[in-house]
Amino acid sequence: KVQQLLKDYFDGKEPNKGVNPDEAVAFGAAVQGGILSGEGGDETKDILLLDVAPLTLGIETVGGVMTKLIPRNTVIPTKKSQVFTTYQDQQTTVSIQVFEGERSLTKDCRLLGKFDLTGIAPAPRGTPQIEVTFEVDANGILNVKAEDKGTGKSEKITITNDKGRLSQEEIERMVREAEEFAEEDKKVKERIDARNSLETYVYNMKNQINDKDKLADKLESDEKEKIETATKEALEWLDDNQSAEKEDYEEKLKEVEAVCNPIITAVYQRSGGAPGGGSSEEEEEEDGHDEL
C-alpha cells in the first residue's frame, strides 16, 4: 500500500526497490548515532536527521481535558512551558498527570505517568501560578517538571520510551480515532470550556469583592449584596446542573455578567481606574490560566 501511495504521489513513477530494507535501517541508525555522539566527522556534518514526537504530549486539567503542550510531529529535542493555576480555594497540592494522544479528553488518551506537587501556599482559587515544563531530549526521553512560582517548590518525573512503547500501528490507530471522533470531541470540550468559564468568572467575582486590594473597599453595601446573591445563585445552579449543555452555561454566564459588570463599571468610573488597582489586561492574564 505504501509503495502504491508513493507511486501515485510521484505521478506514476516506480519506487526504487534496489535497497535492502534491513540495511537501510542499520545504515540510518549508524548515521543517527554518529550525529548524536558528535563522532560522525565530515561524513555526517551536512546530514540532518529529524526525529519527531509521534503523539501529542500534555496534562489533564479541570474537566478531564487534555491540555496539549507538545503537539504531534514536533521536532525533538524540544522544550515547552505553560503556567497553570489551582481549581479550589486554599488548595495546597496539585496532581500532574501526563498523557499522550490526540483526543480532547484524557480518558481517550494514554497515561504516561503522574506526580503531585505539594506545599503550595494556601490562596484563593486561581491565584497560585504553577509552571509546568515538558522537555523531550534527542533520545525521546520526556522530563516533566512542575514548579510553584510563589514558593519555588518543584517536583519532576522522567518518562523513558523503552517501557510500554506504542507500536506504529497503535499510534496510527490513535490518530485515526482522533480524526473519526473530532466533531464529537469538539462538542464535549466546548461544553466543558463553557462550564469552566462560568465557574472561573463566578469565583473571580467572589474573590474580588472580598479582596481589599481589588473591590472590597470600593463597593457600596447594596452593590456587594447584589454580586454576592448573583454568584451564590450561580454556584447553586452549577451544583444542580452538572450535565447542562454548552448553551445553558453560556446563558447563565450572561445572566451573572448582567448583574456584575454594570457594578464593576460603576466602581471603575468612581475610582478613575481599573478595579483592583491594575490594568484589565493584567487581570485577564492572571485569570487566564488553565486549572489543575
UniProtKB/Swiss-Prot annotation:
MF terms (GO), sorted A to Z: ATP binding; ATP-dependent protein folding chaperone
Q: Which GO terms describe its cellular component?
A: endoplasmic reticulum lumen
The annotated regions of Acidic residues compositional bias extend over 280-292
Q: Where in the cell is it found?
A: Endoplasmic reticulum lumen
- The yes or no answer to whether the keyword Mitochondrion is present is no
Coordinates of motif Prevents secretion from ER in the sequence? Answer: 289-292
Establish whether keyword Glycoprotein is in the entry.
Answer: yes
Q: Which InterPro entries match?
A: ATPase_NBD (IPR043129), HSP70_C_sf (IPR029048), HSP70_peptide-bd_sf (IPR029047), Hsp_70_fam (IPR013126)
Which residues, renumbered to this chain, are glycosylated? N241
- Identify the SUPFAM superfamilies for this entry: Actin-like ATPase domain (SSF53067), Heat shock protein 70kD (HSP70), C-terminal subdomain (SSF100934), Heat shock protein 70kD (HSP70), peptide-binding domain (SSF100920)
Give the keywords, sorted.
ATP-binding, Endoplasmic reticulum, Glycoprotein, Nucleotide-binding
Q: Which residues form a coiled coil?
A: none
List the residue ranges of the region (Disordered).
268-292
Gene3D superfamilies attached here? Answer: 1.20.1270.10, 3.30.420.40, Substrate Binding Domain Of DNAk, Chain A, domain 1 (2.60.34.10)
Q: Which Pfam families match?
A: HSP70
Lineage: superkingdom: Eukaryota
What family does the Swiss-Prot or TrEMBL record give for this protein? Belongs to the heat shock protein 70 family.
Question: What's its job?
Answer: Probably plays a role in facilitating the assembly of multimeric protein complexes inside the ER.
Identification of the protein by name: Luminal-binding protein 2
* The species this protein was found in: Nicotiana tabacum
Its taxonomic path starts at: Eukaryota, Viridiplantae, Streptophyta, Embryophyta, Tracheophyta
What would be the name of the gene that encodes this protein? BIP2
